[in-house]
A protein has these predicted regions:
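Short beta-strand segments enriched in small/hydrophobic residues
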Residues: 9-29, 126-129
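Periplasmic-binding protein-like
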Residues: 14, 84-91, 188-195
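A short, Lys/Arg-enriched amphipathic alpha-helix followed by its capping loop at the start of a domain
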Residues: 31-44
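N-terminal beta-loop-helix "entrance" segment that forms/cooperates
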Residues: 49-69, 163-169
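Glycine-rich, highly charged phosphate/nucleotide-binding loops
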Residues: 60-77, 171-179
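Beta-alpha junction/loop-to-helix N-cap segments that form part of ligand/metal-binding clefts
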Residues: 67-99, 103
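Short, acidic/small-residue loops that bind anionic groups at enzyme active sites
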Residues: 101-122
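Active-site rim beta-loop-alpha module in soluble metabolic enzymes
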Residues: 142-195
Length: 195
């Protein structure tokens, strides 16, 4: 006789900016929600939210810091009507991850921290592709804060703004592919993170 325990989890994915007010709108929010639902274990509940009074994208240290308080306030608001077991911060910069963990009593996952640690399990070195050269130092600092300097092969920039990545997919894929070749062949990375 074997028994199975099924855990129900309620997971919130919070985009720390105003995605619905941007060029990709509600359609992108729903696309992410569908992906997360497809990837999650049944009978988990996954809901994607954004921050209506947040910026349209996070492409600098200033925008990252400016996103934290509105995002924390938004998650606080959501907890008033949702029973949350865990949350995912929907930005590779993990803006305010420590603040979120301080403010809430459920696990908060940062995609950069999580993917960097996962990359270390998949290979010896990883690289990060970020959006602008101006963000190279931010990404390197983040790797350092997570204690993974010795696993970092490189940080390179695609130099396409977040809100334009999906505008011309051929251009984005060609630039991404060219960077990936350099990362593998010149930097000797085993894994590549898109951030």
């Amino acid at each position: 006789d074997s028994s199975c325990i099924i855990f129900f989890m309620s997971i919130v994915y919070l985009v720390p900016g105003n995605m619905t007010g941007g060029p990709y709108g509600l359609k992108e929010l729903k696309r992410r929600e569908k992906l997360l639902k497809d990837w999650s274990f049944n009978p988990s509940k996954v809901k994607v939210y954004d921050v209506p009074n947040g910026g349209s994208s996070i492409e600098s240290s200033y925008e990252e810091i400016a996103s934290i308080i509105p995002a924390v306030d938004r998650l606080s608001e959501i907890t008033k009507y949702e029973n949350i077991d865990a949350a995912i911060l929907g930005c590779f910069g993990d803006p305010g991850l420590d603040v979120f963990r301080e403010m809430f009593d459920f696990p908060i996952i940062g995609p950069a921290q999580t993917s960097m640690h996962t990359a270390c399990q998949l290979g010896h070195k990883f690289s990060v592709i970020t959006i602008f050269d101006s963000m190279l130092n931010m990404a390197e600092k983040q790797v350092h804060e997570y204690g993974l300097d010795h696993h970092l092969a490189s940080v390179r920039a695609i130099n396409i703004p977040v809100l334009e990545l999906l505008k011309d997919l051929d251009v984005t894929y060609k630039k991404m592919s060219k960077l990936a070749d350099k990362i593998v062949n010149e930097d000797r990375a085993d894994a590549i993170l898109l951030g």
